[in-house]
Amino acid sequence: MKVKPEGSPGLYVHVPFCRSRCTYCDFHVAALRPGVVTDYVSALILEIQHHADAGFSPETIFIGGGTPSALSVEDWTRLLKCLSESFQSGLKEWTIEANPESIDEQKIEIALSLGVDRLSTGAQTFVETGLALLGRRHDAQRVHEVHDLFQKLGVPRTSLDLIVGWPGQAIDSVNTDLAAVKEIDPDHISLYHLSYEQGTWLHSMRERGGLKPIMDDTCIELSRAFLQGLQEQGFERYEVSNLYARGGASLHNLNYWERGEYLGVGSGAASFMEGLRWKNKPDVQKYISAGGSPEKVSIETPELLEVVTELIMLELRLTRGMNLNRFKTETGLDFHEICGESL
C-alpha cells in the first residue's frame, strides 16, 4: 500500500472486548467470550499480516478498544508478537491501552520484551463514587498499584486517562485526582470532558431524569482548576485534552490531529489512506468469518470543503495553532486569502 512520502502513517489495532460496558461508552465493543476472543485475534493477525505483506509500514502503533489488556496471556502474546515481527523498521511509538483491573506484571513484561514503549491506563478518576457512576471495574488503589508496576518494570512512557464533568463532581474531587496524579507521576495525561452519547446508560438516565448533570459553567470551572493544577505540577498542555510532563506528545494521536494517514485493523476500525476514508464493518462475527479480509463500509473521498473544514477543526485543537504551509499543501489554497477577512 502506497503512503505519501510526507505522511506519518499510524496503525490502530481494535480489540473490542470488555467484561462490562462503562456507563459513558458508545464505542464498538463486544462481550468477552474466550473462544470468540481467540478466533478474533487469529483473524486480526491475518489482517495485520496482509497489510504487512502489501508493504504497509507504520511509524506508530496504538492498540485500543474495548479492553486490550483483558486478552488472555496467550492471545496477548500472539497479537503483540505478530505486530513486533511485522513492523520493526521505522517504528517510533507503540502504545497499548490498559485497564487497571486486567493488566498485570506478566503482560507488561511480555509487552516490553516485544517492543511496546508506552502504556496508557484508563483511570478516569480516583474518587470511588465517580468510579461507580462511570461503571469502572477497578478502585483507585489499583491504579496506584499498576503504576508502581510500570515503574518497577521500567515502562519507558506512561499515560493516564481522566474524566472531568461527571455528575456530582466538585472541586474536592478534582483535588483528589490531582493529588493522585502527583503521587503516581505519569509522563502524560489525557483529560476528557464527560459526554452523554446516545445509547449509553448515562444518556438514558439523564433523559429519564434519573441523574442530574452538572451545569456547564461548573464543568468549565472544574476543568480550569484541573488544568491549572496539572500545569502547576509541570505538565505542558499541547492539545485541548492532552498534556505531558516528560516524553513528549502522543505521536499516534498527534498524527490524527495533523490529518495524517492511518490504517485501522479489527472490527469497526477506521482508516484514512491516500485521500480515502473507510472503516471495517463493525461486526465481530463477520470480522472473524472474513479471515483477514474484512468488509469495508462508509467508504468516501472527502471533498475540498470537507478537507478545509477538517484541517481547521483538527489543527485548532493544538496549542501551536495551524500549520499554514500544511494547509496550502493539502488544499492548494492560501488560508489568508480565503479566511483573512474573518480573522
PLM regions and their residue ranges:
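C-terminal scaffold of the Radical SAM
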Residues: V3-G10, V29-H51, S57-L333
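Local cysteine-cluster metal-coordination motifs and their immediate loop/turn environment
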Residues: H14-V29
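Short amphipathic alpha-helical interaction segments
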Residues: L333-L343
